[in-house]
């Protein structure tokens, strides 16, 4: 339940709980594939005149690839959500605030879920393991499976220094 009717606040804070499918249109353009549902829980409460504060959390699994060897990797993603929904447009200077129309009768929590998920998804790639060796730059073999047999690359910029080192040993 991520659409909350404002009349529900007559009974006090509103508990929110939802499970959104990974292919929900809300997550289009996210830049990551969701490998499971997005589970959202939280508590929405009135925080003054025409202001509502939502504190919650989300968790899901993102399917991505290792940035070194390109193996498929599943990464658990968890995030806390703190959002202020307000009809007072002077309070919108806070980056965690969301505007409500003055005539609004419900609060849509989905934009806050999307934004927090977008911020929580790893942007710079992940590793399949901390010591991932990646791919051979010559043949493309996965070096985690063992050596590829390619000759080590020689950096010709260091040949003069290697020759000098050889002369000093003699």
Language model: regions and residue ranges:
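Structured interface patches
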Residues: 1-170
């Amino acid at each position: 339940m991520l659409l909350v009717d404002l009349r529900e606040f007559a009974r006090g804070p509103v508990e929110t709980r939802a499970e959104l499918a990974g292919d929900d249109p809300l997550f289009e353009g996210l830049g990551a594939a969701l490998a499971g549902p997005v589970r959202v829980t939280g508590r929405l409460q009135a925080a003054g005149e025409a202001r509502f504060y939502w504190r919650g959390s989300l968790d899901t699994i993102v399917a991505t690839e290792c940035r070194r060897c390109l193996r498929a990797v599943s990464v658990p993603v968890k995030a806390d959500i703190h959002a202020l929904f307000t009809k007072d447009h002077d309070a919108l200077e806070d980056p965690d605030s969301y505007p409500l129309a003055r005539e609004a009768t419900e609060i849509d929590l989905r934009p806050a879920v999307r934004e927090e998920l977008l911020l929580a998804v790893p942007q710079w790639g992940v590793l399949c393991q901390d010591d991932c060796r990646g791919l051979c730059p010559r043949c493309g073999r996965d070096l985690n499976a063992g050596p590829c047999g390619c000759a080590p690359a020689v950096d010709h910029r260091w040949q003069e220094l290697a020759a000098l080192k050889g002369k000093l040993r003699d």
